[in-house]
Amino acid sequence: MTVVREELELKARVENPDAVRKAILAAGAELMYRGAMMDRRFDRRGRLEQRDEVVRLRVYHPADKSPEWGVLGWKGPVQRRGEYRLREEWESRVDDPKAVLVILRHMGYKISLRVDRAVEQYRLGGATLRLEWYPAMDVLLEVEGQPEAIEGAVRATGLPRDAFLAESLPYFTAAYEERTGRVARVSRLKRRE
């Protein structure tokens, strides 16, 4: 039987990531990953964007210098479920992300968006929490899981509940630019690959 995977999440701007890290570790969170996380979104002539769908190759570069790996995924249109951002999501781990990149390019896909960040990913109960540091933008915290697990993780952070929004990265980059007057950068690269 095939089960549709639903991604429910919230994001928050974090002023003091050290305090959040300390709070979630004190609540029993377990560090699952630390290192670089590089996302490449693909499209063909804007067709996926028109349908609010995403094809993404995410590449993990662990801080401990162990071998990189990737995750190829598809995400359906954004929806809302109560206070949460919801998308259907299908992913598969890949051992050779460079080969996947070549395959996608040969299929006519081009990179439409790059997102590079250093991350720390934790597991707390049934929730995944990820602190994200971008090249030139606010630190963000993403919390993903089922509603009860998300709310428990949010409480563990010590941040106010109203800091967590059902918004995506463009919302936070625009808020950063409006608040600081500086251009946000979410990729290390300034040119097309």
Model region roles, listed by residue range:
Residues 151-164:
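Long, well-ordered alpha-helical scaffolding segments within enzyme catalytic domains
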Residues 1-128, 163-193:
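N-terminal strand-loop-strand beta-hairpin
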Residues 132-137:
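A contiguous pocket-lining binding segment that forms or flanks enzyme active sites
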